[in-house]
Amino acid sequence: MNNDELATRRAQAIAENRCFSKGRLRDEFRMKPAPGAEPVKWYKNTYGDRFAVYRIADCVPMREKRPLTSKQLLAGQRLSVLSRLNSTSGRMARQAYDWLSLAPLFLDTETTGLDNTTEALEIGLTNASGQVVFETRLKPTVAIGAQAAAVHGISEQALCGAPLWTDVARQLRHAIGGRPVIIFNARFDIRILKQTAAAHRDPADWLEEMTVYCAMELAAGYYGVTNRYGTISLASAASQAGLTWEGLAHSAVADARMTAGVVNAIAAYHPSLMLMYAYISINEG
């Protein structure tokens, strides 16, 4: 609304001797009660709170806001960027960025089920770029549950010639080395690896010594939880990151790659904010 339209609207309301609350005076007429103006009447809103209405003829125009200076605009932008850096999403992005600076590996397993006898039957390990570092199938000592088979499509027949855990554990440990490992739902996959080792009477103490980060907790913090468990699925996180699957979903390597993609997508938010902050700081100086 331009100044002429606003003046016409004010004049019409004054001529009609209309009354308004402070909120409507401000929003519709850019006016406020004059010093000493008394309310015409008091009302209650739906919450039981009282509010006053004033005769518009007893009101005065509000002072026009001055345009912000370039310094004020930059200061506002700087505060906005700082707010985003300190938000949950900003902190999760910084965390992901810090993880990637450690040259982590990304691990995923496919399993025989979900319970405390479940074992891994496929392990995939990639780097942050999605390159395969280690990949194997395993012959478990327990049967594959029907629900698990329906998810990953791996049959017991397909594992007839697969190695045992004891055949590949040393190779897996060597492939990981001392690098941190990022896993989507780390608690689950680490439990499965320990159960698999225990089924073969392998103490696998090195599993306890690994530095492990959970990408599911990271993604839930960044994108928000999406289920009744207070977490987020890899598929949902990938969708929100705008990623598409490389290979079949629910294969260990494909899921490890997708986990890497999600972490990279989250991490990318941090340098973009830092670049904005640096630009503002330079121009403020």
Map each language-model feature to its residues:
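N-terminal accessory regions of nucleic-acid-interacting proteins
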Residues: 19, 23, 62-102
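Short linear loop/turn motifs
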Residues: 35-50, 163-166, 248-258
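Short helix-start
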Residues: 39-79
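Metal-dependent phosphoesterase signature
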Residues: 150-168
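Metal-dependent nucleic-acid phosphoesterase active-site entry motif
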Residues: 109
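Intrinsically disordered, low-complexity regulatory regions of eukaryotic transcription factors
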Residues: 1-12, 53-57
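Polyanion-binding surface elements
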Residues: 11-33
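Metal-dependent phosphoesterase core characteristic of DEDDh/y 3'-5' exonuclease domains
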Residues: 101-106, 116-121, 126-154, 174-285
